[in-house]
Amino acid sequence: MRRTIMSTEKINFDIHKILTLLPHRYPILLVDRVLELEPHKSIKALKNVTVNEPFFTGHFPKRPVMPGVLIIEALAQAAALLTFAEAEPKDPENTLYYFVGIDNARFKRVVEPGDQLILNVTFERYIRGIWKFKAVAEVDGKVAAEAELMCTVKTADAAP
C-alpha cells in the first residue's frame, strides 16, 4: 500500500530529510536541498558545486569542470526524491532507485566550482514499473544539461 507523505503545499527538504530517502552518501550524494516539490508533478533541487568535490582532482586539474554524467546523476537523484515524496519507501534502507535509461541528453554549458546547480525534474508518466521524467539542470538561469530519464524502484533483495 502506498503511503503519501506530502500535501499539495510548497515543500522543501533539507539534507537530513534527503539522507533518510536516498541511499547515496559522500562522494556520490549530489543533492544538497530540495527547494520546491509538488507531488506527482515536479521537483526543484539544489547542488552546491564546490572546488572540494573529489572529481575535480582529475576533471580537469587546470580548469575544473563537473562531469556531465554526474550532472545527469544529480538529476536522477532529484527524480528519486520526487518519486519517494509520492510514496515513501516502506523500508528506505532496503529500497534502491535504479537509473534504467536516458534519452536526448544534451550538455549546453560547463558547471564549475562555485556554481549552484538547480535541478528541475518533471514527472511525465509511469508505465509497467518505469518512471519517466523530463530533467533540466541550470546555472544562473541558463541550461547546463537536459535529458529524459527513466528509473525504477526495487528492494535490495529483489535487485538484479
From Swiss-Prot:
Identify the catalytic residues: 59
What does the UniProt entry say about where the protein is found? Answer: Cytoplasm
State the organism named in the record: Burkholderia thailandensis (strain ATCC 700388 / DSM 13276 / CCUG 48851 / CIP 106301 / E264)
Per its database record, what is this protein's job?
Involved in unsaturated fatty acids biosynthesis. Catalyzes the dehydration of short chain beta-hydroxyacyl-ACPs and long chain saturated and unsaturated beta-hydroxyacyl-ACPs.
Q: Does the keyword Lipid metabolism apply?
A: yes
Please state what the protein is called.
3-hydroxyacyl-[acyl-carrier-protein] dehydratase FabZ
Q: Which GO terms are recorded in the biological process aspect for this UniProt protein?
A: fatty acid biosynthetic process; lipid A biosynthetic process
Which keywords belong to this entry?
Answer: Cytoplasm, Lipid A biosynthesis, Lipid biosynthesis, Lipid metabolism, Lyase
Q: Which reaction does it catalyse?
A: a (3R)-hydroxyacyl-[ACP] = a (2E)-enoyl-[ACP] + H2O
What is the superkingdom listed in this entry's lineage? Answer: Bacteria
Check the record and name the HAMAP family matching this protein.
Answer: FabZ
The record's top EC class is: lyase
| InterPro entries listed in its UniProt record | FabA_FabZ, FabZ, HotDog_dom_sf
Concerning SUPFAM superfamilies, the annotation shows: Thioesterase/thiol ester dehydrase-isomerase
- Identify the Pfam families for this entry: FabA
Alphabetically, the GO molecular function entries are: (3R)-hydroxyacyl-[acyl-carrier-protein] dehydratase activity
Family, as annotated? Belongs to the thioester dehydratase family. FabZ subfamily.
- What gene name is given for the protein in this entry? fabZ
Q: Which GO terms describe its cellular component?
A: cytoplasm; membrane
CDD domains, per database record? FabZ (cd01288)
EC numbers, comma separated: 4.2.1.59
